[in-house]
């Protein structure tokens, strides 16, 4: 019975830490950059896009494909950085065990 109560207490502590972690991940922001800074994407560590900045020189109707490629690249860069930030925060919660790739909170 004492083991069960201990497990329940640990589960409650883990749940509390997870809520705290969610809040921290929401506050962490990363920036994805492409085209030497022509396109920037700001994203939370929870993978929520917060802002997109596009240099006006890319707003040429004849170059839409270039803008699309740079935007995809900046989003991918931001996503990689957000995933790394999430992994780093999860290591503190799990005592150094890393989260399997693609497993988010």
UniProtKB/Swiss-Prot annotation:
InterPro entries: YbaB-like_sf (IPR036894), YbaB/EbfC (IPR004401). One of its GO terms (cellular component) is bacterial nucleoid. It is found in: Cytoplasm, Nucleoid. Coiled coil: none annotated. Pfam families: YbaB_DNA_bd. Keywords: Cytoplasm, DNA-binding. The keyword Cell membrane does not apply. Its main location: cytoplasm. GO terms for molecular function: DNA binding. Belongs to the YbaB/EbfC family. Homodimer. Binds to DNA and alters its conformation. May be involved in regulation of gene expression, nucleoid organization and DNA protection. This is Nucleoid-associated protein RPE_4812. It comes from Rhodopseudomonas palustris (strain BisA53).
């Amino acid at each position: 019975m004492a083991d069960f109560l201990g497990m329940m207490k640990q589960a409650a502590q883990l749940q509390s830490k997870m809520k705290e972690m969610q809040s921290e991940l929401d506050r962490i922001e990363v920036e994805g950059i492409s085209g030497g800074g022509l396109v920037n994407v700001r994203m939370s560590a929870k993978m929520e896009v917060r802002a997109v900045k596009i240099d006006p020189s890319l707003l040429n109707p004849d170059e839409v494909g270039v803008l699309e490629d740079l935007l995809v690249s900046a989003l991918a860069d931001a996503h990689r950085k957000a995933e790394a930030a999430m992994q780093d925060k999860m290591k503190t919660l799990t005592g150094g065990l890393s989260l399997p790739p693609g497993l988010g909170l």
